[in-house]
Each structure stands twice: as structure tokens, then as C-alpha cells.
Amino acid sequence: MTRLVQLRDMARAATGLELDLISGGNSANLPLMMSGTMPSEINNLRIGEAIILGRNTLDRSPWPQTRQDTVEVVTEIIELERKPSIPLGRTGEDAFGQHVTFTDRGTRLRAICNLGRQDVNPSDLTPVDPGHIVLGASSDHLIVDMTDSAESVEIGTEVRFRPTYAGLLATATSSAVW
């Protein structure tokens, strides 16, 4: 960070511009700032993840005195059926070139929700209900195992997730999510 301040000073000398704003990093730099070891000239940090999601970006632990439940991605169940956890017949690559593996858990209550990979990567969503399991997604739909849901579900039930920062970015910029 000291080098960044030196570069600002060199640019000031070379251009005559004030350059009062020095952006020194993002949420990962908060521990440095909080410890008092960040140069005082660093006067701007981009700390959206720490403020909005309440997470320390170095290890994803909760940031002190913040909440981790401030943002939810909400989708709706559009199809709900009991299905075997293992598909019948041969399987191959999905539409995204991935070979999906399946675990035999018997017959499960499977929901199709109106949110898909065009909106968010399913790995960037954590179900609020620990009984929900994200199984995967197509372009348009998210597939969720609802068998161990804390509450009864039906078509039209809202399903809630906590996003990662990448998930928040994707859903916030998707024209299909509002």
C-alpha cells in the first residue's frame, strides 16, 4: 500500500493533478484497515461484499457486527414430482459439457424452479432451508430436492437462497431476475 501512495505522489508531481482519491482495494483489505496498518492516504475501499453479504472475503467467515441474511434470491416452484434419484437409462454430458454424477437416495420429491444458469450459477446459491438440496440447473430451470423441506411445498411455493457475491452479481444484472 505504501508503494501505491508513492505512485500517487509521483503522478501528482508529473501531472500537477491533486489525485486526492486512492482506491486501495476491496473487502479483503478491511482487516488491514481495522488493524490501523493501512496508510492513511488510502481513502477508498470497495467493500460491497462485506457490507451487503456480511462476509470476510479472505475466508468467507461472518464479518463482525454484520448480518449474513440481508440478501435472498427467491424463485418459485413450477413443477413438483416424486422421482427416482438415479435417472433411467444412459446419461451423458449436460448442455454445459459436464458429466453429472448421481447418488442413489431412492425416490425423492424434486422441484423445478423458474431460475436457471442464464441467471445464476447454481453453485452460487445456498438454500435458506437446510432440507433443500440444489441438484443442478438447465439454462432456464433450477432443480431442487425438496424431500427434507422444513415446510410443505407445492407448485407456486417460493424457494429462498443466499447468494455468494458472484451469485448476487449475476442475479442483480440479469434482465430475467427482478
What is each of the regions a protein language model found here?
Residues 84-178:
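C-terminal accessory subdomain/extension
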Residues 1-71:
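Active-site loop/helix belt of alpha/beta enzymes
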Residues 71-73, 109:
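Hydrophobic core residues within well-ordered beta-strands of beta-rich domains
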